[in-house]
């Protein structure tokens, strides 16, 4: 018998275009904005890892009790890629993304959202 469970998680990927490259190279601002965004939904931040590339670009990962948030900047394209997965529920992450997006003020966004279903294979 196949059992299909309700969605147990949510994954959001967003590509943000038209961001000022001075912002995209400001690792401190982006990391603060990302932490503040995660606080919008009370995500449990277990660890933060970040790395600034030379001559430009930045990547950061927030390891969450609920899974992760990861970003990577492409200043040469005025672009940032945001990815969030949360196992708390199918609506999680939307407030986090919206807050983060407002801080960066992109001219255009491409958002893909996917409900993650886990089916018992036993």
Please place each PLM-identified region on the residue numbering.
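Polybasic/polar functional segments that serve as interface/processing modules
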Residues: 1-122
């Amino acid at each position: 018998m196949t059992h299909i469970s309700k969605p147990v998680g949510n994954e959001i990927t967003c590509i943000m275009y038209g961001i000022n490259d001075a912002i995209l190279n400001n690792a401190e601002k982006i990391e603060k904005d990302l932490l503040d965004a995660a606080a919008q939904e009370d995500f449990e931040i277990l660890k933060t890892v970040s790395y600034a590339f030379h001559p430009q670009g930045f990547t950061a990962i927030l390891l969450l009790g609920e899974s992760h948030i990861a970003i990577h900047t492409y200043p040469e394209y005025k672009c940032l890629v945001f990815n969030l997965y949360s196992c708390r529920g199918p609506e999680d992450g939307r407030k986090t993304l919206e807050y983060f997006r407002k801080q960066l003020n992109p001219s255009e966004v491409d958002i893909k959202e996917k409900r993650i279903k886990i089916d018992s294979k036993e």
